[in-house]
Amino acid sequence: LGTGREPPGLQRLAEPLHDRSPHQAWLWKVLTHRSGAPITAPYEWIASGGPVLDQEFWKLTPWQRNSMGQLEAVELHESEMPAAACALDPIAAHAGMRLMISGTTLFLCRRKPWAFSAAPFRDLADCVGAGASLAACMTGSDKPEAENLLEAFTAAAQTAAGKLPSIEGFWLSGGGAYTPIFPPSTYRAVACD
């Protein structure tokens, strides 16, 4: 064993934005036969009871800083969803997107592909905690458009402050179009490495 083998090398499973969630990148490669950033938003939409649509989906997460200065998701209550929809939908429509709501989870969808990728929200605490800004946790040629959209959402939520909980910002992640998932097999899981 081991004779004639190549020296070990570093294998990168995902782009740097997803370094804190390589398990998602690996699972994405196994289940879809595609590389790149793992796309999770359309599957979250479908898992929450939404129909399969031929559009890109993005999960929109409202956030605030906790007492320790870390980012945490703001859980909206069902009674707050109409106010959230009234505040956010006009901005989404102006950007060529549609605000979709499933339960208390916000999604954006659009027909035109978006050259933008962002770290998953649950990884932001590490990303921002390391001294980086939120802007360092996103990439792509459409990044300025996404940043402007997030700023507009934040301003709208703060304007509707009496009807919504304290929201310091929004985050888009998991974006992309639905891709059929292939049944996993041990062979494909190993071959994916």
Go through each PLM region and give its residues.
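…; additionally, a secondary subgroup of soluble metalloenzymes is captured
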Residues: 1-193
